[in-house]
A protein has these predicted regions:
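ATP-binding glycine-rich phosphate-binding loop
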Residues: 1-17
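Short pocket-lining segment of the protein kinase catalytic domain that shapes the ATP-binding cleft
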Residues: 66-74
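An alpha-helical support segment within catalytic cores of ATP-dependent transferases
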Residues: 103-154, 159
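Active-site beta-strand-loop-beta-strand hairpin of nuclease catalytic cores
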Residues: 16-20, 158-159
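A generic fold-level signal
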Residues: 9, 17, 60, 139-141, ...
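A conserved alpha-helical element in kinase catalytic cores
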Residues: 10-11, 21-66, 78-100
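Anionic group-transfer/hydrolysis microenvironments
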Residues: 25, 71, 150-152
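Residues at helix-coil transition
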Residues: 46, 72, 103-106
Length: 159
């Protein structure tokens, strides 16, 4: 079976054989983060968001891997790259997708505002910067609406 690499990221590579998609994490990637991502993806799917359904999580040759359904379509990044004259149309689509995600609620997921607060407090930033960031964050509402943790044109498929 032939596998095509479709994306390379900082912590993983994504392959497909046109039937399934495989997200292969870098060697020795933290097991807890793999299962956390699997849990989050499953909760998002259960909420009704169209995401690839994870079929299995495996460990082989020091690499954690998700196997999921392949979704046909092009990333917004590739559409923008191949058709730059219509970048405004694609950015409008990205805004549409992003705002539609906020309509979903996932009460079992960590609250994004709490996560960001913890990240800021535990960061190596100077105290003044931490205070400024926490002040800005405190102006945001606290809710359990779904927030995409890595929303980029690379992560939006248009079918």
């Amino acid at each position: 079976m032939n596998f095509e690499i479709i994306n390379t990221r900082r912590n993983n590579k994504i392959y497909t054989n046109r039937i399934d998609t495989y997200k292969v994490f870098n060697e020795n990637y933290d097991k807890r983060l793999v299962f956390l991502e699997s849990f989050i993806t499953t909760e998002v799917e259960a909420a009704g968001v169209k995401v690839p359904s994870i079929k299995e999580v495996t460990f082989n040759d020091n690499h954690w891997c998700f196997k999921s359904d392949s979704i046909k379509g092009d990333t917004l990044f590739s559409l923008i790259k191949n058709d730059p004259d219509n970048v405004d149309k694609y950015l409008d689509k990205m805004v549409e997708v992003h705002t539609s995600i906020h309509k979903f609620k996932c009460p079992k997921l960590p609250i994004q505002k709490d996560k960001l607060t913890d990240y800021i407090k535990l960061s190596d930033l100077d105290e003044g910067m931490k205070i400024d960031l926490l002040d800005m964050l405190n102006t945001c509402p606290k809710h359990n609406k779904l927030v995409h943790g890595n929303f980029t044109p690379h992560n939006v498929l248009v079918s």
